[in-house]
């Protein structure tokens, strides 16, 4: 009898442990942001056509909330439910880490749909992730009034993708490749270099988010060494199917410039990276590549007026602003709109000035690049670029420290980019 009672007690204890373990492993994964937003990991989908897993609304399961995402290739999509204050929409991206924490890649929001007021389901397509690992780590990088912040909490996500892939042959560094008469030599490629810029609060110095890819080039055109070409943009891919785009900037440390850097790269232990690099000139332009405009009027306005100007140009079917000037540059028709001076809440409330351009056809679709070469105000002071937005042939630029500006003088160029591809293995910092 005592044995029966003992075994009954043991069975109850084991059952309780099993239930606790089940609840532990199946409890929702939640990250809370500093503004009170609650993010819940819903699930992942893998393939060409994506709809979110079932989510519960008022205790009932629901799936058809309108959020869908399609792709031509098999892709991995992460679904997240965001609970937030009504009319206060969260702004964040995901950072994807391997288990060994050797590197990471970021993913921005691709689509979303409202479940109910204050609750949205969001889709993030992972164009780069550690495909060879059974699990990956996701952290949240949020943007708000407190600046850029990285979450301490994380989502642990199983990898539903295949883990076998081909290997690419690599060329040794230095590696020289060409586009037309331009020969470019990749002289340096280092993954995991310390970034000149910190990614924000909650990100330690050694976090992969604070690492970058350091690289450098030599140029020859028609057999002569050249110094007026610069790398602009790079697409980094690997044989596993990862692909990520980055903008290339100078590598500045301790007031010195040493080549170039970009973020993010891929995982450095992969046997090969393929880099498709866009190069642009900074001088040596012909007359038909240059447009100089003087006395562009500056109108007083607000930050919302700047946003409205962008929206008006982007939505060509809506009401369009009147252009101050227009012409054709290198086969591209360009319209320049009056500038707006405003109090910039994103720059400490100081005075900034913004102007917009509309180019048709889209220069980037033609393998070309539109670049502001020089801008000054009516008093001859050169202005400091604070930021820019572009896409679909629409361009908008912001300049800080723009007090008492009445007019702008600017020069833009439109010229053909060159594209060079390297297949190499990076060294590690």
Predicted features by range, described:
Residues 1-14, 20:
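N-terminal Sec-pathway targeting helices
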Residues 13, 19-429:
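Alpha-helical, hydrophobic structural elements that either
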């Amino acid at each position: 009898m005592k044995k029966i009672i003992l075994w009954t007690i043991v069975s109850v204890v084991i059952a309780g442990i099993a239930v606790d373990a089940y609840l532990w492993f199946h409890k929702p994964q939640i990250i809370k942001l500093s503004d009170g937003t609650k993010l819940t990991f819903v699930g992942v989908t893998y393939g060409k056509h994506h709809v979110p897993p079932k989510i519960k609304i008022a205790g009932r399961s629901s799936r058809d909330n309108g959020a869908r995402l399609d792709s031509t290739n098999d892709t991995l999509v992460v679904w997240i439910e965001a609970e937030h204050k009504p009319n206060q929409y969260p702004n964040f991206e995901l950072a994807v880490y391997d288990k060994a924490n050797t590197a990471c890649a970021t993913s921005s929001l691709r689509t979303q749909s409202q479940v109910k007021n204050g609750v949205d389901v969001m889709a993030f397509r992972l164009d780069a992730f550690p495909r060879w690992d059974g699990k990956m780590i996701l952290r949240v990088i949020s943007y708000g009034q407190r600046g850029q912040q990285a979450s301490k909490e994380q989502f642990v996500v199983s990898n539903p993708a295949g883990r076998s892939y081909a290997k690419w042959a690599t060329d040794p560094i230095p590696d020289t490749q060409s586009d037309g008469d331009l020969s470019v030599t990749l002289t340096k490629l280092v993954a995991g270099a310390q970034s000149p810029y910190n990614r924000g609060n909650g990100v330690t110095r050694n976090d992969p988010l604070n690492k970058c890819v350091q690289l450098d080039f030599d140029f020859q055109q028609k057999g002569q060494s050249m110094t007026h070409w610069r790398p602009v943009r790079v697409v980094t891919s690997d044989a596993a199917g990862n692909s990520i785009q980055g903008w290339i900037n100078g590598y500045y440390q301790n007031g010195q410039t040493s080549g170039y850097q970009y973020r993010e790269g891929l995982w450095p232990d992969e046997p090969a990276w393929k880099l498709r690099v866009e190069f642009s000139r900074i001088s040596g332009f012909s007359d038909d590549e240059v447009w100089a405009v003087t006395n562009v009027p500056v109108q007083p306005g607000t930050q919302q007026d700047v946003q409205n100007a962008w929206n008006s140009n982007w939505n060509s079917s809506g009401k369009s602003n009147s252009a101050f000037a227009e012409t054709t540059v290198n086969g591209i028709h360009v319209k320049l709109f009056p500038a707006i001076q405003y109090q910039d809440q994103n720059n400490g409330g100081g005075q900034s000035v913004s102007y917009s351009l509309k180019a048709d056809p889209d220069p980037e679709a033609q393998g070309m690049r539109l670049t502001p070469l020089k801008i000054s105000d009516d008093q001859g002071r050169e202005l400091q670029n604070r930021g820019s937005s572009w896409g679909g042939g629409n361009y908008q630029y912001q300049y800080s420290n723009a007090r008492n500006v009445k007019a702008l003088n600017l020069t833009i160029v439109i010229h053909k980019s060159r594209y060079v591809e390297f297949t190499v293995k990076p060294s590690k910092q």
